[in-house]
Amino acid sequence: MNEQYSALRSNVSMLGKVLGETIKDALGEHILERVETIRKLSKSSRAGNDANRQELLTTLQNLSNDELLPVARAFSQFLNLANTAEQYHSISPKGEAASNPEVIARTLRKLKNQPELSEDTIKKAVESLSLELVLTAHPTEITRRTLIHKMVEVNACLKQLDNKDIADYEHNQLMRRLRQLIAQSWHTDEIRKLRPSPVDEAKWGFAVVENSLWQGVPNYLRELNEQLEENLGYKLPVEFVPVRFTSWMGGDRDGNPNVTADITRHVLLLSRWKATDLFLKDIQVLVSELSMVEATPELLALVGEEGAAEPYRYLMKNLRSRLMATQAWLEARLKGEELPKPEGLLTQNEELWEPLYACYQSLQACGMGIIANGDLLDTLRRVKCFGVPLVRIDIRQESTRHTEALGELTRYLGIGDYESWSEADKQAFLIRELNSKRPLLPRNWQPSAETREVLDTCQVIAEAPQGSIAAYVISMAKTPSDVLAVHLLLKEAGIGFAMPVAPLFETLDDLNNANDVMTQLLNIDWYRGLIQGKQMVMIGYSDSAKDAGVMAASWAQYQAQDALIKTCEKAGIELTLFHGRGGSIGRGGAPAHAALLSQPPGSLKGGLRVTEQGEMIRFKYGLPEITVSSLSLYTGAILEANLLPPPEPKESWRRIMDELSVISCDLYRGYVRENKDFVPYFRSATPEQELGKLPLGSRPAKRRPTGGVESLRAIPWIFAWTQNRLMLPAWLGAGTALQKVVEDGKQSELEAMCRDWPFFSTRLGMLEMVFAKADLWLAEYYDQRLVDKALWPLGKELRNLQEEDIKVVLAIANDSHLMADLPWIAESIQLRNIYTDPLNVLQAELLHRSRQAEKEGQEPDPRVEQALMVTIAGIAAGMRNTG
């Protein structure tokens, strides 16, 4: 581990030096000296030197407006380079990700050593593996795509420099390339000028597929196959690909008026176009590789006389022609041209699969397995994973939009107002209409624009090739009628298949009622007939934590899942739980392995479906090697959770969690909802108002333009508190509740829960990670610089609470300091703090200057505004998870 730290530190220091030279070349010695002085003061301040801390504050307060941007950019770019170095070190031979594929081997060995598990049972568990990762464009991916590409190249240089055998001239060439890349980054604006459109976000998702997943997925499957052969003597069937990718980019219209039916239609076409583009490159390689002559009679019959000379090439060239024709047609459609469908248009995965698989079988039968298992096998696996749609999309819409559409319709038909009916009346109407053979929508009806949009979206789903849309997610779902309403709207659009419709339960009350809602639905005969034994339910992490605090929310999520698993098991329904986690702790983020093993027993039987959000996509799938590592971690965790499920918690543990939940929720809401000073404090102590100026995502920060904390989306709420380092949403209420239970004499019981119950130990581990990233002196500095003195007591109270919380968490976990069992992460946080601290101090200063100008009725200085945006991006890089 120490070797890993020192290798990381020396790379970070080397990159910092190159950045320093770049700054000196661009802006002169005096700016570099200023940056170096600040860095040294920050390092000394971190080591506990109070005089230097004071000097750091004074130096940053006294920067002239001309110095603000260069200093902010220097520390922000440094953090991007540090993250790149860390990403490289995680996949370098000494790093943690390099050992992650080993996770599969370790898991298989662990499972084989369990006397109650036969090899056959383990094989069956492997065969039922299912992992669906849903990529979402959260506005927290702050780094521009342009800079991400440069950082990928920096990573490649670090990898080559690690090779001890390279010649001096090669070493010098690589160093020159590094200098060029860092100079290019320095001279590139790190802040987007315009908000991305939903189509831009979708293209960002396709870039992740092309640059990383396309190679990463086949590599992961080779790794998995190797471990299975070695440990179980079992070969993965060619058609077995347990991982799929879905996207919300272009499909998630919840609170985002920019995602329309036309946008979704466009993104579906664009996704298919990108798939043809990537498969064409694969097929081109196969045309040149598969020059073999010998083939089975079956393959020769397939190609006929015309193709007998080079049967494999003949099939590949045919497939290439079909792909080219499909691509040309899609291109015309994207330009708005209406062309007749060409002959051989590819719409189904089977059409790609069959010629490729015919070649594979023939090569195997003719003793050319070594060739079959090369590029051809990788392409076959890509067909199974990505296929014609490349990534499927989910549609997500808020429940009230469907209710309003049906209300408008029933009023027009003169049969009453659906919106004001009781739940029983709504259900009776919906079931009657779902069973009816006549259409419900009148031909000459002219609905409002909002309702038209809901109906048009259903039309897009009905017209899309089957398999290109994965599920319809209903956010803020509360009742059975919310689910039935979507089925009725889809039926009216003429959908010819049963589309999975997933209610998303996301507030504390909705999570507590989730099981009742699903029980009622499963008691409806028509509904049981429709779903054919399969149900997806989405669990919301971010909104429940914002509603009730992290402790109450996580217990409600656990209980909702637990009850749903038991209800579906009893009813003979295969349940897929869809987890809407974020990258940050306040939105349910946790290291994958720990998070999965902390769920209720049986929660992964129907596979894992989970959102991968914004900035976390780059950290977990930004390079093919990291993709292999992340998928291996998930695989190991799913196998372990299904074959060695965590124990059912004792009744006394459940009672303690109930108690913790009530106490923490009361305290959290007491501050956030009931304390009259809280909202003014939040608005002034964090850059919440300024965040709205950042052109981050295509979606507005608020569900409604006015209103307090409750109208804010969960992401800006978390993002704002991460910026001022108080990290409040991720801990408020939790420690106080633990302290109360300790005072009631139950510390030994809490310690047992921490030892023996993965759910509870993961909660404590997540709290420790938050506390390690929080910084009370910085939070206090924001107060002093930005907050009205009358509100200072509230800030002090919150900081004191955090100090007490840290003590109680360490006492229960029996640790002397935070992150004792994860030294690698603790080291990484410490390394970045030296560069993040100056950005925090500078941000408080910039907010002060900007708000002061506004108070005096002046336009804020553009240099101040630009530097402020850079500090927001830089702190996000330093914290490694934004919202």
From Swiss-Prot:
Transmembrane segments: none annotated. Belongs to the PEPCase type 1 family. The active site is at 138, 546. Gene3D superfamilies: Phosphoenolpyruvate/pyruvate domain (1.20.1440.90). InterPro entries: PEP_COase, PEP_COase_bac/pln-type, PEP_COase_Lys_AS, PEPCASE_His_AS, Pyrv/PenolPyrv_kinase-like_dom. One of its GO terms (cellular component) is cytosol. One of its GO terms (molecular function) is magnesium ion binding. NCBIfam families: PRK00009.1. Pfam families: PEPcase. Its EC number is 4.1.1.31. It is an enzyme of class 4 (lyase). Keywords: Carbon dioxide fixation, Lyase, Magnesium. Its cofactor is Mg(2+). It catalyses: oxaloacetate + phosphate = phosphoenolpyruvate + hydrogencarbonate. GO terms for biological process: carbon fixation; oxaloacetate metabolic process; tricarboxylic acid cycle. This is Phosphoenolpyruvate carboxylase. Forms oxaloacetate, a four-carbon dicarboxylic acid source for the tricarboxylic acid cycle.
